[in-house]
């Protein structure tokens, strides 16, 4: 079996899937170069979107704010208020499925569904913190113009719309009020804002990283040449999922062509929760075509479909558990087949941890903070994949520490809390 594993590793190297091709420091250098170009507004795969939102100074005590969180899969609504110690209180929390996940919708149907989700809390505040987790061009009035819907959401006629204005219009159509003050932000900005709560220890600057259905990051920036030069510190969103990684190979490119939006968000498709499971199945099929696994197992793999990232995480942790969906979907019983599959999945998990760490590290480095004990960078981490995939998270954090602290002397700490996106959206909605 050792020979089989060695041959499998060689095949993954040839396909540019093996983690050895993805050195974290090299990746960070590439990302930082693209970030600089994006801030200048020229020739970058990273949007580097200014948000016109800065860190919170004072959070109003006791004032309610409505929060709407439109993510890659789930739609959440709630009412949030902060007590005198800065602690958030989340009330009336309701979770639904995002419109466009189960069936295609048009623009009106999409925003009507969002407005309907606020019916229970619409009369309790005139302020809305609207977290919309898709690429937007942010406006000085804190609305956001959608660049492109993604994460496999099926919604036609929505690209190019001002999402805050569309939400207000939908709420008026539903008889849910007229005068609304809406602040639009995405999930990474919301996570960063949550980390600015005064209850946290002192810090020099802020960044945030999201690894859920999708992937993104943001940080505080004051030097934005495309806005005309130095500005007051504000959150800049990388749109990191769109990074055009020069190290990406044909296996990833072939997988991208199977997705709903080929050519877009190609970095995200290498490791985010919405794609890691399907990518793993794609890699197993690639290996089956190369002659790996027993004949019976090759047949089962090539006929299989429907693996999710949660299935991959469970198999990676417990490969000998025959009750797991991964084992059942692939009808995998032979121990040699199990060992080969686990080795391939482990390569993808290690690569994912390096890709994730590269984005986190680049955002932290770009804050230009953390070089003395009083200026540590607070990095808020959020996302279902990051928190539930324990081994991926542990490896990512090890790579992050090795690069930032051991090699570069940058002090940072990771911030995590329940409902970070809801809390951060509430803070933004109150500013």
Predicted regions mapped to residue ranges:
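Short, acidic Gly/Pro/Ser/Thr-rich loop/turn segments
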Residues: 75, 135-139, 215-218, 245
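Glycine-rich phosphate-binding loop of actin/hexokinase-like ATP-binding domains
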Residues: 87-90, 152-158, 190-281, 285
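Short, internal active-site loops enriched in acidic
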Residues: 133-138, 188-191, 383-387, 419-421
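Short glycine-aspartate micro-motif
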Residues: 63-69, 127-129, 181-183, 206-210, ...
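Glycine-rich phosphate-binding loop and adjoining helix at the ATP-binding site
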Residues: 95-112, 136-200, 204-207, 228-247, ...
């Amino acid at each position: 079996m050792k020979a089989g594993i060695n041959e499998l590793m060689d095949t993954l190297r040839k396909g540019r899937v093996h983690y050895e091709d993805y050195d974290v420091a090299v990746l960070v250098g590439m990302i930082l170069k693209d970030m600089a170009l994006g801030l200048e507004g020229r020739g970058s795969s990273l949007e580097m979107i200014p948000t016109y939102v800065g860190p919170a100074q004072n959070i109003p005590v006791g004032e309610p704010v409505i929060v709407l969180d439109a993510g890659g899969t789930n739609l959440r609504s709630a009412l949030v208020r902060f007590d005198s110690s800065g602690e958030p209180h989340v009330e009336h929390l309701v979770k639904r499925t995002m419109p466009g996940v189960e069936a295609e919708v048009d623009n009106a149907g999409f925003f009507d569904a969002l407005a309907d989700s606020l019916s229970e809390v619409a009369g309790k505040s005139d302020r809305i913190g609207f977290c919309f987790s898709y690429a937007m061009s942010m406006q000085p009035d804190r609305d956001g113009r959608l660049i492109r819907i993604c994460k496999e959401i099926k919604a036609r006629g929505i690209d190019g719309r001002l999402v805050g204005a569309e939400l207000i219009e939908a709420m008026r159509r539903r008889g849910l009020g007229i005068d609304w003050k809406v602040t639009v932000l995405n999930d990474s900005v919301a996570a960063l804002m949550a980390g600015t709560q005064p209850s946290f220890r002192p810090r020099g600057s802020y960044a945030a990283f999201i690894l859920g259905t999708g992937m993104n990051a943001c940080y505080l920036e004051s030097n934005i040449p495309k806005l005309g030069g130095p500005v007051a510190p504000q959150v800049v969103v990388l749109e990191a999922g769109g990074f055009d990684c020069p190290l990406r190979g044909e296996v990833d490119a072939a997988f991208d062509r199977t997705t709903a939006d080929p050519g877009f968000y190609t970095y995200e498709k290498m490791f985010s929760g919405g794609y890691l499971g399907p990518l793993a199945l794609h890699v197993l099929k690639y290996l089956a075509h190369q002659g790996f696994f027993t004949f019976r197992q090759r047949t089962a793999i090539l006929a299989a479909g429907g693996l999710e990232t949660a299935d991959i995480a469970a198999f990676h942790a417990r490969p000998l558990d025959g009750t797991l969906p991964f084992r059942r979907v692939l009808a995998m019983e032979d121990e040699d087949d199990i060992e080969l599959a686990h080795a391939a999945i482990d390569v993808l998990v290690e690569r994912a941890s390096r890709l994730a760490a590269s984005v986190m590290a680049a955002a932290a480095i770009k804050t230009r903070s953390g070089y003395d004990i009083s200026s540590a960078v607070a990095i808020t981490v959020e996302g279902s994949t990051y928190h539930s995939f324990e081994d991926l998270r542990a490896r990512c954090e090890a790579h992050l520490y090795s690069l930032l602290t051991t090699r570069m002397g940058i002090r940072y700490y990771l911030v995590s809390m329940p409902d970070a996106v809801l809390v951060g959206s509430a803070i933004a909605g109150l500013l």
